[in-house]
């Protein structure tokens, strides 16, 4: 899980 520039949690 990573947090992108717009504070959205993305699971890769």
From Swiss-Prot:
One of its GO terms (molecular function) is hydrolase activity, acting on glycosyl bonds. Has weak beta-1,3-glucanase activity with laminarin as substrate. Keywords: Allergen, Disulfide bond, Glycosidase, Hydrolase. It comes from the Eukaryota. Its EC number is 3.2.1.-. This is Thaumatin-like protein 1a. Monomer. On the 2D-gel the determined pI of this protein is: 4.4. Belongs to the thaumatin family. Not glycosylated.
């Amino acid at each position: 899980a990573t947090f992108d520039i717009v504070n959205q949690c993305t699971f890769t």
